[in-house]
Amino acid sequence: MAVQKHTVALFLAVALVAGPAASYAADAGYAPATPATPAAPATAATPATPATPATPAAVPSGKATTEEQKLIEKINAGFKAAVAAAAVVPPADKYKTFVETFGTATNKAFVEGLASGYADQSKNQLTSKLDAALKLAYEAAQGATPEAKYDAYVATLTEALRVIAGTLEVHAVKPAAEEVKVGAIPAAEVQLIDKVDAAYRTAATAANAAPANDKFTVFENTFNNAIKVSLGAAYDSYKFIPTLVAAVKQAYAAKQATAPEVKYTVSETALKKAVTAMSEAEKEATPAAAATATPTPAAATATATPAAAYATATPAAATATATPAAATATPAAAGGYKV
């Protein structure tokens, strides 16, 4: 089933200017048949003293505090501009227009960041995150038509940017449902995206405050608990789409790495894939088809939820389930992911 067309909501401000009101007499153009004796003119009233103009309200500024946060705010703004630009071109040109507009905005943001003294190390870290997000989006953009390709690209990039913003604890407006409505995803899937996204943000925040050697453990425990609490009764029964199951296995496999920070960063990358995978749910023909594609009950027991994957998979199982391609790609992407 082709990716359904997303609804792009653009809020256009329309200024309605009213003309001055005219009197009925002037409109009719009539003069009295018998002019009345004019009344004595009234004493002119003393003009009132003009009120002091109110001080214009200050334009609210962004809430970002670090250079990384300021940069991701600009990237988010570029995302919005790219969506707006793509909305006014023919379907066949949407993908190209979005990529070009977003690329220009991103490059401009990095140039401005360097001009303001943004540290090269931090820039490289954020660049790595953004590159990984763009790669995920590009891989997802496999629609049958140019517009479907654009829709898949934007939906996946949206979720990837949300995760990056969550990692950086950015308080700016995130490029999510305001502009791009992923209407083809079932309501349950949308709720799950939000729950995993919230759990991820909670875990990333907790891990950021932990010592380097404890980051992965803190992240894992916090994420597991948040998922279990948010899913409630569905915790033991919910079947994720196959792509998500594979990503969760990869996240668990990260525990086999030797360095604590490597375990944490590889897990971050894998969970980012997990969140973006859910934005591709519209590619499934039907919810039933997605359930059919879910691994066997035995495998699902170990991987149906992030917490289950962490808690029940053994090191040997993790080694067996992580595909060679994923295992090869993840460490390379992890290089710039120090949070």
Curated annotation (Swiss-Prot):
Residues 36-58 have a biased composition (Low complexity). Pollen, starch granules. Residues 1-25 form the signal peptide. Residues 32-58 are annotated as: 9 X 3 AA tandem repeats of [PA]-A-[TA]. The keyword Repeat applies. Residues 36-65 are annotated as: Disordered. It comes from the Eukaryota. Sequence repeats lie at residues 32-34, 35-37, 38-40, 41-43, 44-46, 47-49, 50-52, 53-55, 56-58, 285-290, 292-300, 301-309, 310-318, 319-327, 328-334. Residues 285-334 are annotated as: 6 X 9 AA approximate tandem repeats of T-A-T-A-T-P-A-A-A. InterPro entries: Poa_pIX/Phl_pVI, Pollen_allergen/Os. The keyword Signal applies. Keywords: Allergen, Repeat, Signal. It holds the Pfam family Pollen_allerg_2. Belongs to the Poa p IX/Phl p VI allergen family. This is Major pollen allergen Lol p 5b. It comes from Lolium perenne. The lineage of its organism: Eukaryota, Viridiplantae, Streptophyta, Embryophyta, Tracheophyta.
